[in-house]
UniProtKB/Swiss-Prot annotation:
Source organism of this protein record: Pseudomonas putida (strain W619)
Family matches, as InterPro entries: UPF0250_YbeD-like, YbeD-like_sf
HAMAP family reported for this sequence: UPF0250 (MF_00659)
Family in the record: Belongs to the UPF0250 family.
The protein, known as: UPF0250 protein PputW619_0619
Amino acid sequence: MSEPDVKSHKIEFPCADYPIKVIGDTVVGFKDMVIEVLSKHAKVDLATLAERQSKEGKYTTVQLHIVAESENQLHDINSALRATGIVKMVL
């Protein structure tokens, strides 16, 4: 029995419509902080911006799309967001 041909999903750069989801503590200015950090590293499409709070209000999720240029850029974005101390997860 042969194994199915499974291709890994690689991102082709540049990717003009790369979705980013940032989850963090609900604090005043969280959305603006996310936009500021992302804008330092990539072109941000603010038309795709969505913000949502968790049921209990403890966490906030900010979603938007960026122009992703490279794996290094995505790594730098992740590092910069995590360095804020209020970001819990970047997807």
